[in-house]
Amino acid sequence: MNRNPDQNTLPNITLKIIETYLGRLPSVNEYHMLKLQTRNIQKITVFNKDIFVSLVKKNKKRFFSDVDTSASEIKDRILSYFSKQTQTYNIGKLFTIIELQSVLVTTYTDILGVLTIKAPNVISSKISYNVTSMEELARDMLNSMNVAVIDKAKVMGRHNVSSLVKNVNKLMEEYLRRHNKSCICYGSYSLYLINPNIRYGDIDILQTNSRTFLIDLAFLIKFITGNNIILSKIPYLRNYMVIKDENDNHIIDSFNIRQDTMNVVPKIFIDNIYIVDPTFQLLNMIKMFSQIDRLEDLSKDPEKFNARMATMLEYVRYTHGIVFDGTRNNMPMKCIIDENTRIVTVTTKDYFSFKKCLVYLDENVLSSDILDLNADTSCDFESVTNSVYLIHDNIMYTYFSNTILLSDKGTVHEISARGLCAHILLYQMLTSGEYKQCLSDLLNSMMNRDKIPIYSHTERDKKPGRHGFINIEKDIIVF
């Protein structure tokens, strides 16, 4: 039987806190379920909603000025959400409301509210790069890799982009400057900071507090637009979340990484923003070309890739003194695939202290083998490399999350061979190891190559797990 609690037998302070929050006397079940939440509930109850409304209005004026909504509508939406619990009787939904309100009252001011106050002066730190000089070289490299055969019957799962992306990008530019110790960017926008001719869509970010930031941003968009905003978690992408609107239009996504991973990611400082070192990004691009659908993207829009590739090539030429004369030495390193065990053996003795690298195409098999080795020195760089690395008895063990392209039965295609070499070089950069000679040879191995057709490719590792989401409107959290 669901009775009201007896005020003589229950602690009056706890009861009063819950009663004030719910706007009603709690049932016995509500009381016992919510009493451990009293600290969070107190913070929500005493939270100054007027100051919060003011901050959201300032965010709206600065970053969403073209969105047609009034100050009174924003205030009504905020006050409505902070009183939503008074009309909610489902315990699960009450827990969700408390959790999300707690995030807002404890983090919003420091994360997004701070963007409305005067910013520090921007330290201009741009270097003039001669990207034009690299365009023909980039075009030659990419042309030799433009070997994908497009299946016109194949339906590609491309996300629809929200009209709010430009507003969020404006906010993100400021966010990256204010929070440059916990958030860095990569991808097209980061290259745009080097070469203004680069086109970019949304801003790709890595950060250490992704979930909190995305919740705060989702509420900001909800309060300004009135739209239902949904946060989704994809199981096969590590620590990845995306914000979409009620029509499934993509707004922004983010990868979360640990602070110790953030500390070792190579980065450079441009206009008060940290971006992932373009050398590291170039290696990631070479690695990603081993993915069959990335080659299909190249086939559809080669000029987009050419602008990015030329920018990164010029950066490494300027920064590392790379000479593009075709001297490739032992690059790409010899790669032998065992299609039964799904392990590629890369001969590394010409460049590194470890004699070979065993590249696993199934992550769970690698994890099992590492346990059998009884070694506890593996490095996990999370979504930065999508892999752990272990060096044990002069052998590197690692996982490769992309497809492996084959140029003939049992023969690794040179595009994938270079991708595997790039994957090993990512580790060298992250651990401050030697990589420059290997980098030079790898890049030179991409010059003056003929197109080699793709015979077949291995399938990617299938990741278990289910999709998670936060639906603000329906008060549901599934993770």
UniProtKB/Swiss-Prot annotation:
Residues noted as binding Ca(2+) 2 in the record, renumbered to the chain: 202, 204, 253
Family: Belongs to the poxviridae poly(A) polymerase catalytic subunit family.
Keyword Metal-binding attributed: yes
Keyword Transcription: yes
GO biological process, alphabetically ordered: mRNA processing
EC id: 2.7.7.19
InterPro entries listed in its UniProt record: PolyA_pol_cat_Poxvir, PolyA_pol_cat_sf, PolyA_pol_nucTrfase_Poxvir, PolyA_pol_nucTrfase_sf_Poxvir, Poxvirus_polyA_pol_cat_C, Poxvirus_polyA_pol_cat_N, Poxvirus_polyA_pol_cat_N_sf
Active site (catalytic residues): 202, 204
Regulation: induction: Expressed in the early phase of the viral replicative cycle.
Gene Ontology molecular function terms on file: ATP binding; metal ion binding; poly(A) RNA polymerase activity
Reactions that this protein is recorded to catalyse: RNA(n) + ATP = RNA(n)-3'-adenine ribonucleotide + diphosphate
Keywords: ATP-binding, Calcium, Early protein, Metal-binding, mRNA processing, Nucleotide-binding, Transcription, Transferase
Upper lineage: Viruses, Varidnaviria, Bamfordvirae, Nucleocytoviricota, Pokkesviricetes
Subunit relationships: Heterodimer of a large (catalytic) subunit and a small (regulatory) subunit.
Pfam families registered for this protein in UniProt: Pox_polyA_pol (PF03296), Pox_polyA_pol_C (PF12629), Pox_polyA_pol_N (PF12630)
Amino-acid positions noted as binding Ca(2+) 1 in the UniProt annotation, renumbered to this chain: 202, 204
Species assigned in the record: Ectromelia virus (strain Moscow)
Broad class of enzyme this protein falls into: transferase
Functional note: Polymerase that creates the 3'-poly(A) tail of mRNA's.
Name under which the protein is recorded: Poly(A) polymerase catalytic subunit
Domain of life of the organism encoding this protein: Viruses
